UniProtKB/Swiss-Prot annotation:
Protein name: Putative hydro-lyase Bcen2424_3550
Species: Burkholderia cenocepacia (strain HI2424)
Keywords, sorted A to Z: Lyase
Record-linked InterPro entries: D-Glu_cyclase, Putative_hydro-lyase, UPF0317
EC number: 4.2.1.-
Amino acid sequence: MTPSEFRQSVRRGAFRGPTAGHCGPFAQANLAILPDAYAHDFLRFCQANPKACPLLGVGEPGAFRIDALGDDLDIRTDVPSYNVYRDGRLTERVESLDALWRDDFVVFAIGCSFSFEDMLAREGIGLRHVEEGCNVPMYRTSIANRRAGIFGGQLVVSMRPLRGADAIRAVQITSRFPGVHGAPIHIGDPRALGIEDLNAPEFGDAVTIRDGELPVFWACGVTPQTALMDAKLPIAIAHTPGHMLMTDITNASLAVF
């Protein structure tokens, strides 16, 4: 299935699940959507936190398309599920933004680690959340983001359990893709990140960690959602964690070496 066909299946309601493992060679994007009055500060926030918030594209006020991401793309309908935040609280989860869209909304598309998973799979590195048919586990850490204006919050990380040799290879592979979070930020003891229980992720689903495996943590594009909550905007919208926007950008084009 092409990215365009995948987006159309989402648009007509045929697909509503997590997007990991779909359209493997193509990049997926996290979303943050907020009123134009706050967009400049949020842009500075992304620039100050590039590991967690690598920008793939920024829309014009009111625009629900970003041409660089896909020709027939519609931000309002092409994500399987959206989180709606009001005054810093998650108030609803919706499948379309048609009824909520405003002329002053600015869209930020942020790189997603699902994009490099195809490269890991090609190297024979198994991905537990794909094997178990669930969402990748994501955790809020104790690490504060670099603040920009009203935006702060805590770093969120995704976790994939890997054997030692695979973890080393994963560092080598993902280092080539800083536009989709790049290399892991930590391998091993989750308490170093302020994570007490790997079986209780704040976002996504817990996965099995087998004997001899290490938890490997990447900066995650859900991080902006902690910043949106921290800022307590009157309204802000994001993808539901794990439910990404499929783009026409190839993963190979994001490699820096």
